[in-house]
Amino acid sequence: MAKVLVVADINQGVLKRSTAELLSKAKAIGAETAVVAIGRNIESLIPGLVDAGSDTQYVADDPALELFSAGPYASCVVEAAKQFGADLIWFGFSEGGKAVAPRVATQLDAACANEITALTLEGDQIEVIRPAITNKVIQRVKVNTDRLVAVIRAGAFEATEGITGSENVVKLSAPEPDSKAVIKELVSDASGDIDLADADIVISVGRGTKDQAGIDLVKELANDLKAGFGSSRAMVDAGLMPHNKQVGQTGKIVAPTLYIAIGISGAIQHLAGMNGSKVILAVNKDPEAPIFNVADYGIVGDLFEVVPVLREEIKKIRA
């Protein structure tokens, strides 16, 4: 039986959806499952980790781990992997995961694969699938090492309701501080917006929104739907949206239930960040915009006319 260690994705004391998705997949392939949680004051998350399907919970809870630092976090994951005897170590697709995974792979002499969208396990043979060249090709990779460290794309696996694990907590000691880098402060998004990675609905704006008035109008729609609010790279480059809202190859990778692209033409770099969405709705006044080639539903029209109608229809449905 394979042993899968999932690295819990925790942001400001909140367990991210990707953790449950990875644990569900581990259960689905019949693996023995464990999770490692790292941070400060995180023991309250243990029941949620059990409910998500973990059978063993490695917990590194220490004031020294309050601020993310790739070196110490990697040391905690390596220690948990050794104690558990993990064959597979899975990270969610986050900046932290992408920073820690290569360090863990190096220390464990394991293979490391990034942006995984599918994984199969037959006997001792592990095979992963990942996009490459801005999603123009799909790579099928056979792993020839005993261990694999993988960073899994958002939405690649579904969280399954009704599964559960068992509580078996193993406490880990905090490693020595990283002498090469000292984290002084982490600055979080102060907008209060829903995290793009966890949002069931994401609405993004592109150059077609033109100016702040267009952005504000679409933001009101996002508020109506309690949706995450993102943008294309063009809006970031123009200084109209912050980089942490950028969806695309060089920004956030999202896979919500519904993705609404407003005023976005559909550059390949943007599509690479949202083509895992379950349903895509595009709004653009250009009927030839490439975004319509990937959209499930399309509305050709000016956003200043379309968005108010959408908001009004939403109000009618909720009335």
Where in the sequence are the language-model features?
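N-terminal glycine-rich FAD/FM-binding segment characteristic of electron-transfer flavoproteins
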Residues: 1-319
